[in-house]
Amino acid sequence: MSIKFSFKDEVFSLDKLQLPSRHYHFNDNENYIKLLNIGEGIFPKDKIRTSLSLDNSNLIFTTESATKIYPSKKEYGIQKIDIVLKNNSNLEFINDELILYKDSRYIQFFNLKSDENSTFFYTDILSRGRSFENFDFSNMLIKNSFFCEKSMEYMEKFDVKGAELKDYINRKSSSNFIFAKIYIKTNNNEEFLNRIYLEKFESFTYTKNKKIILGVISSNNMFELKNQIFKIWELYRKELNKSKFNLGKQ
């Protein structure tokens, strides 16, 4: 199952839709796509691919709601996301949280390729599951790859078992159990990182070649966590001389 779309010179094109989903494209002031998966989740054996290309274009992209990963005895639900940015493009990908149900198994492949002058803001959020669960999923495998100017700039791999993550948080005696990872590329990363520090977000740093900024934030409240993300996103938009944007979600 897949969806593939692109923008060239700010013009939208839906290239493929073989996915039980709806997408909403708005263009009052900026290109904005909200993607709604029917059933709002990923089931065992699902293989979902999202492909996006921007050429001299800007896009704000988000999901309608949290992505639920349903239980499985042995099969994995798989999601693959491929993104290409070129010719001064800008992507702002505001992801809602993953909710891994008890006994769920999930694999994610995320690949982003950007040229020198394009920019992006991308977030991933992991919750502890449904309100009555506490990292009771079986296994989560993540591979995120970022390329800048055709060279690998950053890659991370996670093989996480719910029981191990729960044990780690308990040993750390942390009250926070919701985590967000943020990936940012601007045209002046040094200046933007200093701006983040001034706002008291301290868990941010560069990748090896300083072409991407990485950050982690955590909280025990989803509303509070998303407010932190939106604050950093607002700083990013100011860096691009853009005003605050309302996603129009609860």
Curated annotation (Swiss-Prot):
Transmembrane segments: none annotated. The keyword Cell cycle does not apply. It comes from the Bacteria. One of its GO terms (cellular component) is cytoplasm. Pfam families: UreD (PF01774). One of its GO terms (molecular function) is nickel cation binding. Keywords: Chaperone, Cytoplasm, Nickel insertion. It is found in: Cytoplasm. Disulfide bonds: none annotated. Required for maturation of urease via the functional incorporation of the urease nickel metallocenter. Belongs to the UreD family. UreD, UreF and UreG form a complex that acts as a GTP-hydrolysis-dependent molecular chaperone, activating the urease apoprotein by helping to assemble the nickel containing metallocenter of UreC. The UreE protein probably delivers the nickel. This is Urease accessory protein UreD. It comes from Aliarcobacter butzleri (strain RM4018).
